[in-house]
Amino acid sequence: MSPLSLAEIPQVQAFQTGLKRLLGVRRVLALATQRRLICCWQHKSLWYWRSIDWPPDACRDGMPMQREVMSEALEELLFDSDVVGARLELLLPVDGVYWRVLDGVGADVFDSDASSAALSNGLDWPLDPSESYVTATPCADAVVAVGVKRTMLQAWIDVVAQADLPLQRVDWLVSCAQRCLHHLSSEWTGGVAWLFSHGSAVRLVLIHDGVPEVDQTFARDGIEPEALISEIRRSVSAWQTLMNRFVPLGWWLSFPESHNQIFMPLIDAARQDCLLNQPFAWNPAPWGEDSGDDPLEPLEQLALIGMLVEIH
């Protein structure tokens, strides 16, 4: 029998793993979607990413339905990628989380009392105040409340806890991506129209001075592109009329390049509209050959960049 090397002894392996945890804390960004989990981390000054698909129906409307299975998937993804000592920063899925701009509360006078008073007046969203968690944060010159059911937030906390990982931060994919978008388009002085996929639908967010004022979803199944374009145009025109604000629009399209072409007719050059999309300076590399079947989507990458950049 060939001699057993020290590295193959289970006790030594456990000791080495524990030592790695003590010596190196690894920041890991974890982005959860309805379909998959994406993890990003830094290794030797370079950023990498890897994804794993959830089992069927594991995540439904943003809620983890199979916590133990999902926890094992998270643990396995990091273990197979040799990521030890991870401290997780989690981005919640698009579904199940809501946001609203607080009326009468400006970022210049933002404090907990002002936001609490605004929240106590009730918000037009499908969340029960007694059964939800709400946080209010400055957004440009306004304050935005982001809310989620406590059961959903606790379910995601449980997924991370069962993987024996410390959870350092929880954010939301959409609001984090919007903060990054504001940062990337800071030199644009007009309004911003942001389009991205939401399941089989298309979501439009209209932004003025860094504040999201309209968030509307458009069905896409069975709808001809021309009809969809017309619907979006009507919403934009209604917003501009209501605000008495007819300024050029900068469009940010968070779709794969081939899908962006569908929405290019929305950009009205005669009104000095333009496409704000720009190449991302941060492009993590896939980890290994089995990093995932699909590349990072533009919305996912926008949100991950938002986690890395402190935006004031």
Regions found by a protein language model. Give the residues of each.
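Hydrophobic/aromatic-enriched cytosolic interaction surfaces used to assemble or bind macromolecules
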Residues: 1-312
